[in-house]
Curated annotation (Swiss-Prot):
It is found in: Cytoplasm. NCBIfam families: pth. The gene is pth. This is Peptidyl-tRNA hydrolase. Belongs to the PTH family.
Length: 194
C-alpha cells in the first residue's frame, strides 16, 4: 500500500463560500494544519495554499486549491507533477451528498459521483481515479435540482454540529493513517457514529 504524500481539501475560494457545505474538505485541512502546528501559504505555481509537514516522521503536503471547485484538478495536477506524487499517494477530502451529515468514509478509487472537483482531478491526473478519498457527509436536499443551491449554502445548526463532530473524528483518523496505516484508519472512520 502506498504512503500518502499529498492531502487535498476541496472548496471554493473567498469569504462568500467559506462556511458553505461544499467547503467541508477545506475545513478538514484547516483542522489538520492546526493539529500539525503549520500554516498554509499561497503558492501561485500550485494554484492554491500549501505547506509541507512531517506526520509521524513521514513527509506530507497539505493543499487547498484556490481555484473554483470545478478547476481543483489544476492545483492537484500541478503539485503532484512537480513533486512526482502518484495518484495512489494522494488523499482528496471532499463533501459528499450521498452520506448524511455526521458521517464520513475513506475509500480508494471509484467514480466522481457528479462531484465537479473530483471530475477535474481525475482528468488532470491523466484520467487516473486511483487516489484515496475522504468523503464528508453533508446530506442531500432531496431533489437533484436543489443540489447546487444546497452545497453553496451554510449547513443548518444541527448539521453544523454533526459536521463538527465528524471533522474531529476525521482529523484523528487522518493522523492515524500515518501511525497505524490506511486499513485501521478506514475501519475506524467508516464505522463512526455520532
Amino acid at each position: 500500500m502506498s504512503e500518502i504524500k499529498l492531502i487535498v481539501g476541496l472548496g471554493n475560494p473567498g469569504e462568500k463560500y467559506a462556511d458553505t457545505r461544499h467547503n467541508a474538505g477545506e475545513w478538514l485541512i484547516e483542522r489538520l494544519a492546526r493539529r500539525f502546528n503549520v500554516s498554509l501559504n499561497p503558492e501561485s505555481k500550485f494554484f492554491g495554499k500549501t505547506v509541507r509537514t512531517l506526520v509521524n516522521g513521514k513527509e506530507v503536503r497539505l493543499l487547498v486549491p484556490t481555484t473554483f471547485m470545478n478547476l481543483s484538478g489544476k492545483a492537484v495536477g500541478a503539485l503532484a507533477s512537480f513533486y512526482r506524487i502518484k495518484p495512489e499517494e494522494i488523499l482528496v477530502i471532499h463533501d459528499e451528498l450521498d452520506l448524511p451529515a455526521g458521517t464520513a468514509k475513506l475509500k480508494q478509487g471509484g467514480g466522481h459521483g457528479g462531484h465537479n472537483g473530483l471530475k477535474d482531478i481525475v482528468a488532470q491526473l491523466g484520467n487516473n481515479n486511483n487516489f484515496y478519498r475522504l468523503r464528508i457527509g453533508i446530506g442531500h436536499p432531496g431533489h437533484r435540482d436543489l443540489v447546487a443551491g444546497y452545497v453553496l449554502n451554510k449547513p443548518s445548526p444541527a448539521d453544523r454540529n454533526a459536521l463538527e463532530k465528524v471533522l474531529d473524528e476525521a482529523t484523528d483518523c487522518v493522523e492515524m493513517i500515518f501511525k497505524d496505516g490506511m486499513i485501521k484508519a478506514t475501519n475506524r472512520l467508516n464505522s463512526f457514529k455520532i
